C-alpha cells in the first residue's frame, strides 16, 4: 500500500483554488486549442504542468526578499550568490541568468565557436526540449545516448537516467572534433525524472576529458539526483547530500541551471564555470546584451538573495525525503489502480506511459497529449506531454519521428500540494483509465516551427 510521508513544514499562508464543472472545462480546453499550456491558470484546479518556478518559498526566503540590493552593478546579493556557488559546487565563476534557457543561450554559441569540427554536435544522456532547441539555434546537432534500460517503463532499474556508455564512446569516436560538449542532465527529465549514478557521471567525464571535450552539467535537479545516489548506491549510504553534490560537480567543467527547480525560487538561473576564465569572459560578453549586466543577469537583487538561501534549503534531508516520497506516493497510488508509469518513480514527477495506456492512438496523434487533455476534462488537473509532440520534427528532413517515449508528466511543485491532492489526482486518472479506449488522438490546427508544444493549437482527430 502507498505510504504517506507528512510534510516537514507548517503552512503559513494559503491560496484558494477553484473547482469547475466538466462543461466549463471542455469549453476552456476548446478555447485553448486543446493545449493545456494555453489554459488560463484560474481555470486549473491542480496544476502539474511543471515544477519550474511553481514551488513555495520558505519564511527565510521571504525574509531574504526584504534584503534585496537593487544596485545595477555589484549587488551584495550577487556576491552572496557567487559565494554560495563556490561553497556548494566549487565553481569559481558565476553568471546569474533569468532562468535556465538564458544560461543555455549565452553558453552554447561560445562552445560551438570553440568546436574544432565543421558539424558541431552536443551529446547528452537526454537533452530536454529547451536544451535541444538552444543547441540547434546555435547551429549544432543534439544527439542522445540514454541507457536502453530506460525505455522499458514497466521494468524497475535504479539508474534509468544513465548514459549508454558504449554508445557514447562510439559517437565520440565517429564524430571526433565535431563534439562541442557532453551534457550530463541530472536528473534526466525526459526519461522520467530518473537519476544518473555517480559511477556513470564519473565514466562519462573521464571519456570526455580523455578526448579534450568539455563537460556541461544540466543541473536543474541536482539535489534530487544526489538524494537518489545516497539512497540507491551502497557506496554513498550515510554520506551527506552536500558531499555527494560536490563530487558530482567535480566531474563537470561548467554547469547551467534552471534555479526554478532545486533552487526553490520562482525565477532565476545560473551559468557557472569551474576554472575556465577565458570561456567565462566570453560568455559574460554575451550576457550583457542578452540577459543584462553580469552581476544581475535579468534578476532583481531580492531574487538572487532568495536563490542563495534556496540552494542550501534544497539540500535538507527532511525536505528531500518528503519531496521524493510524495512523488513516490502518487506513483504507488497509480500503480495500485493499474495505471502504467515509468518505474521506479523519479524525483520531480510521475510519468504515465500513454503508449501503453492508449495503444490505439498513433505517435503522430500524440497519445500523451491526448491523455493530458482527458485528465483536465476529468478533474481540472493540468499535466504535460513528454513525447512526440515535444520531440518535434527532424531538423533536416522536417518529418515527424516517433519519440522513444510517449509519457504524460505529472509534475509536482515543491512545497505546494498535500498528499490529499495526490489522492485526488490518482482518483481522476484511474477514472480516465477505465474509459481509455474512447480517448481520441489530436491533430494540428496550428504548428509553430520551434518548441511547438508551447503554443500549438490542435483538435480531436
Swiss-Prot record:
One GO MF term, please? tryptophanase activity
User: Part of which pathway?
Assistant: Amino-acid degradation; L-tryptophan degradation via pyruvate pathway; indole and pyruvate from L-tryptophan: step 1/1
- N6-(pyridoxal phosphate)lysine carried by residues: 261
Task: Name the InterPro entries on file.
Answer: ArAA_b-elim_lyase/Thr_aldolase, Beta-eliminating_lyase, PyrdxlP-dep_Trfase, PyrdxlP-dep_Trfase_major, PyrdxlP-dep_Trfase_small, TNase, Tryptophanase_CS
Q: Which Pfam families match?
A: Beta_elim_lyase
Q: Name the cofactor(s).
A: pyridoxal 5'-phosphate
* Keywords linked to the UniProt accession: Lyase, Pyridoxal phosphate, Tryptophan catabolism
Q: Which reaction does it catalyse?
A: L-tryptophan + H2O = indole + pyruvate + NH4(+)
**Could you confirm whether the keyword Cell inner membrane appears in this record?**
no
Return the EC number: 4.1.99.1
Q: How does it assemble?
A: Homotetramer.
To which protein family does this belong? Belongs to the beta-eliminating lyase family.
Which named protein is this?
Tryptophanase
